[in-house]
């Protein structure tokens, strides 16, 4: 899980989801997981 000020998709399988007011990137590749904060 990477914590970043801005999140963006790394590959085609990445999806951006807003959960409890926090933007997150969910992907099959664990390395691509991100959250904004």
UniProtKB/Swiss-Prot annotation:
InterPro entries with a match to the protein in the record: Ribosomal_bL36 (IPR000473), Ribosomal_bL36_sp (IPR035977)
NCBIfam families: rpmJ_bact (TIGR01022)
Family listed: Belongs to the bacterial ribosomal protein bL36 family.
Keyword Methyltransferase: no
Keyword set includes Ribosomal protein: yes
Coiled coil: none
Protein name from the UniProt record: Large ribosomal subunit protein bL36
GO biological process: translation
GO molecular function: structural constituent of ribosome
Position of the signal peptide: none
Gene it is expressed from: rpmJ
PROSITE patterns (alphabetical): RIBOSOMAL_L36 (PS00828)
Keywords tagged on the record: Ribonucleoprotein, Ribosomal protein
Domain of life: Bacteria
One GO location term (cellular component): ribonucleoprotein complex
């Amino acid at each position: 899980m990477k914590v970043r000020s801005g999140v963006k998709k790394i590959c085609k399988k990445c999806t951006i989801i807003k959960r409890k007011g926090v933007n997150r990137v969910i992907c099959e590749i664990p390395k691509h997981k991100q959250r904004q904060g």
